[in-house]
């Protein structure tokens, strides 16, 4: 089990009672694990990293991990000697067994386990534009954890499981992801309900951080560079935090991997803020965001950018950059990856591939650098060969203006 104290990622203040933010500077909470050495256990999936996960127990039926391998196909196309790919999805030939085909399973399993460890009997509440909802629906159905999903109506077709749905209620939101978050927050504030927590959820971040841990376990060192497509940027924060723990161990490298984070322009709040262009909601409304994006799961109006311990701190600390990738470059990158590596990927992951192509062409990486590319989702077509999918029905549809009666009805259902 991962024994830890909770501290502010900004000022280091000790946080009590599972606090979601620091009362001194509003910083993100961070787990300070008692175990300082990287010592993977002989347990399945991400549970092998249980010493650096904020859980007491583990569930054999959940916790599929990402798989890291050395690329030959894409590496040859880009002229790279040491390109490593972290694949989160379904690709059994590589040992990747995430049946919702997204790295969001890395968040769902430890979050569910942390909730069960508390034995509070609460119903989990999650807001999502698609991939997160799918992962939590799968994991909670397997473990019989009651779950309420708030999903934009436009994203409902992405919500499916490969198991019979459990105690999962799907609420279609007339609005975007930000509206789904607002409604989820209202319900989560009421007795008997527990918010998933977003970027402030240490189980979510440390679960995603296992992408970096798997690379270190397999290849015995930290990479020089790390590439990922981001929406909120929480995945980048997670890898930064995991890297600091590895460096403290002292056996696998002394320098942080340089974070190369990518967003899908023009709907790119983190990219805009990093480059000093602001992030006004009116700007995104003018572009029709998130409609028209190569993958709208990468759009988050309110990312944890400037908060202590957030995206800005992570990128400044690692000394690299944030990319803006338009649709045409993402489409080309997706074709390049699928052709060279032989597996289908989710559109969001292609934005990271495009950033890597950009970095190679611009000379930001050297041919012999160790590079870790996070393919955050893929294998949907491959999954169809082995498993059927069960589409979750929408139980009710609500908007911000007419939500109170609906939320009261939900309370009665889960009372």
From Swiss-Prot:
BP GO terms, sorted: coenzyme M biosynthetic process
Protein name (database record): Cysteate synthase
Organism (species): Methanothrix thermoacetophila (strain DSM 6194 / JCM 14653 / NBRC 101360 / PT) (Methanosaeta thermophila)
EC number: 2.5.1.76
SUPFAM superfamilies per UniProt: Tryptophan synthase beta subunit-like PLP-dependent enzymes
Binding partners and assembly: Homotrimer.
Keywords attached to this entry: Coenzyme M biosynthesis, Pyridoxal phosphate, Transferase
Upper classification of the organism: Archaea, Methanobacteriati, Methanobacteriota, Stenosarchaea group, Methanomicrobia
Pfam families: PALP
Primary enzyme class: transferase
Pathway given in the UniProt record: Cofactor biosynthesis; coenzyme M biosynthesis
Catalyzed chemical reaction(s): O-phospho-L-serine + sulfite + H(+) = L-cysteate + phosphate
Entry-annotated residues carrying N6-(pyridoxal phosphate)lysine: 104
């Amino acid at each position: 089990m991962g024994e830890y104290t909770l501290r502010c990622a900004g000022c280091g203040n000790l946080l009590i009672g599972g606090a979601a933010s620091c009362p001194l500077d509003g910083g993100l909470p961070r787990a300070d694990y008692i175990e300082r050495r990287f010592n993977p256990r002989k347990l399945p999936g991400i549970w092998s990293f249980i010493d650096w996960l904020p859980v007491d127990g583990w569930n054999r039926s959940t916790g599929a991990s990402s798989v890291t391998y050395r690329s030959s196909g894409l590496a040859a196309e880009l002229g790279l000697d040491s390109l490593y790919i972290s694949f989160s999805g379904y690709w059994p030939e590589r040992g990747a067994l995430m049946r919702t085909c997204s790295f969001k399973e890395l968040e769902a399993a430890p979050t569910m386990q942390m909730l069960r460890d508390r034995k509070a009997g609460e119903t989990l509440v999650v807001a999502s534009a698609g991939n997160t909802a799918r992962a939590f629906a799968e994991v909670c159905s397997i473990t019989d954890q009651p779950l309420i999903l708030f999903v934009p109506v436009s994203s409902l077709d992405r919500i499916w499981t490969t198991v019979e749905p459990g105690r999962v209620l799907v609420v279609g939101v007339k609005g975007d992801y930000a509206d789904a978050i607002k409604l989820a927050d209202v319900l989560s504030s009421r007795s008997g309900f527990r918010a998933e927590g977003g970027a402030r959820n240490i189980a979510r971040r440390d679960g995603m951080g296992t992408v970096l841990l798997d690379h270190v376990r397999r290849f015995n060192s930290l990479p020089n560079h790390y590439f990922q497509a981001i929406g909120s940027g929480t995945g980048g924060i997670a890898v930064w935090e995991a890297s600091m723990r590895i460096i403290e161990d002292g056996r696998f490298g002394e320098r942080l991997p340089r974070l190369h984070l990518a967003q899908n322009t023009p709907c790119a709040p983190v990219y805009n803020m990093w480059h000093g262009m602001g992030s006004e909601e009116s700007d995104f409304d003018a572009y029709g965001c998130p409609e028209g994006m190569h993958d709208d799961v990468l759009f988050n109006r309110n990312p944890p950018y400037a908060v202590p311990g957030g995206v800005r701190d992570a990128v400044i600390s690692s000394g690299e950059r944030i990319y803006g990738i338009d649709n045409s470059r993402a489409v080309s990158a997706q074709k390049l990856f699928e052709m060279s590596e032989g597996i289908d990927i989710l559109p969001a992951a292609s934005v990271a591939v495009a950033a890597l192509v950009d970095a190679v062409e611009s000379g930001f990486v050297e041919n012999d650098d160790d590079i870790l590319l996070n393919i955050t989702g893929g294998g949907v077509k491959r999954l169809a060969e082995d498993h059927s999918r069960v589409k979750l029905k929408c139980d009710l549809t609500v908007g911000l203006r007419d939500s109170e009666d609906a939320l009261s009805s939900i309370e009665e259902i889960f009372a």
